[in-house]
Amino acid sequence: MRALLLDIGNTRIKWGLADGAKLQRTGTVTHEKIRDAGIAALTTRLPRRVDRILACNVAGTSLATRISGVMHLHCDTDTHFVHPARAGFGITNGYGRPRRLGVDRWVAMIGAYAEFSRALCVVDAGTAVTIDALDRQGQHLGGQIIPGLRMMQDALTSETDGIEVDIPRSRARPA
């Protein structure tokens, strides 16, 4: 089964084409590029024939709705959005209200636990940095969200006097 996997983040959309359990191709496009060049900045890189589209979205419902519509036209397939659950894929959600856990954190833990099947500290560094702990049984023990490198750099330089940040802007972008 060919599946198109979409990670709709706050800064970028990352995608991967999976054939069974194997990732065949990947790509990324920034929201800025889509604003400047149009949605073709994403679709020209994507396959047209897939059996399923799975998406993880933290960028809001407006963009999710737009991407879902475009994917339906491009691939003639509905987009299925992942949501955190009480348990799934070997992970037990540590939140009393499972959907309060960010879906990006949920899928990062699922992927890490599927790969390593042991106690883990899962770190995802993007626009924000998320850190989550899993025990060896896959129980989510809790986590933290902190600003990403660019947000921290911007806060320091705009809210303080006399601090010079010597990280080039091009290196301060999320992966």
Task: Describe the predicted segments one by one.
Residues 77-90, 127, 161-172:
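Acidic-glycine-rich active-site phosphate/pyrophosphate-binding loop
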Residues 1-4, 8-87:
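N-terminal glycine/serine-rich phosphate-binding loop of ATP-dependent small-molecule kinases
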Residues 87-120:
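Conserved phosphate-binding catalytic cores of ATP/NTP-utilizing and phosphoryl-transfer enzymes
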Residues 8, 57-58, 83-85, 104, ...:
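Fold-independent oxyanion-binding glycine-rich loops
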Residues 34, 62, 100-107, 151:
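Conserved active-site and cofactor/substrate-binding residues in soluble primary-metabolism enzymes
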